[in-house]
Design a protein with these regions (language model features):
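A short, structured surface patch at a secondary-structure boundary
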Residues: 1-82, 88-91
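Extracellular/periplasmic catalytic domains that process cell-envelope and extracellular macromolecules
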Residues: 17-18, 82-83, 103-104, 161-165, ...
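Short, solvent-exposed loop/turn and secondary-structure capping segments
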Residues: 35-39, 100-103, 182-184
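Flexible loop/hinge segments at secondary-structure junctions
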Residues: 36, 153-156, 187
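Short, structured coil segments at secondary-structure junctions
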Residues: 40, 105-107, 195
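Extracytoplasmic substrate-binding proteins
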Residues: 77, 88-179
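Alpha-helical, coiled-coil/dimerization segments enriched in small aliphatic residues
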Residues: 180-196
Length: 196
């Protein structure tokens, strides 16, 4: 509900989130990327891993202490999280977890399932969810529309019949001595296909 308004018709057992939110903890880089796209990094007070973080502004926020590292999934620093007192925590319910202890902190946990999307535009559309949270629905819709238009414009360059020979792509990563390959019906497979 809009911040400062009384919710009506919502059962008492439901958790009410007031928007626009003032602060949030992001558990994945995809969640964080939506705040970057919306120009709302000032609302991100906590993040997990910074291994794949290449955003200069967020790295500066981490160095200055405006945003804190909260640990990794399954091993969160609840004291740090409580000291930040975020309005909510965006979680990935199908990852390693460790959210049981966070539930005891009393901060709403909101599932963000963007990484389960099977298409690049499906993932990009989660910017609309963040737009709702930060009270910028129109900007989020415009942001997504611009992403979709540019994506489809680039995709058209490699449409069937426009590319003589398509490369074969094997993608994945080495982790813990095992090679993890991208599935043929995955987000990345669709991205490679659309790229030609």
């Amino acid at each position: 509900v809009r911040r400062g308004t009384k919710p009506s018709g919502i059962p008492g057992s439901y958790t009410v989130i007031e928007t626009p939110i003032r602060s949030v903890v992001c558990m994945t880089s995809l969640q964080l990327s939506n705040f970057i796209k919306m120009g709302e990094l000032d609302k991100v007070v906590g993040v997990t891993s910074t291994r794949h973080l290449f955003n200069r502004e967020m790295n500066e926020r981490l160095k200055s202490g405006k945003t804190a590292k909260i640990g990794i999934e399954g091993n969160f620093d609840n004291e740090v999280i409580m000291s930040m007192n975020p309005d909510l925590i965006l979680v990935s319910p199908f990852k390693r977890g460790g959210y049981e202890t966070l539930k005891d902190v009393g901060i709403p946990l909101i599932p963000h399932l963007g990484y389960k999307e099977m298409t690049p535009l499906g993932q990009a559309e989660w910017v609309k969810f963040v737009g709702l949270l930060v009270g910028q629905e129109q900007k989020a819709n415009e942001t997504f529309d611009a992403i979709a238009a540019r994506y489809n414009e680039l995709k058209e360059l490699t449409a069937e019949g426009k590319v003589k020979k398509r490369p074969v792509v094997l993608s994945g990563e080495m982790r813990g001595g095992n090679w993890y390959a991208v599935g043929g019906e995955s987000f990345l497979a669709q991205l490679f296909k659309d790229a030609g």
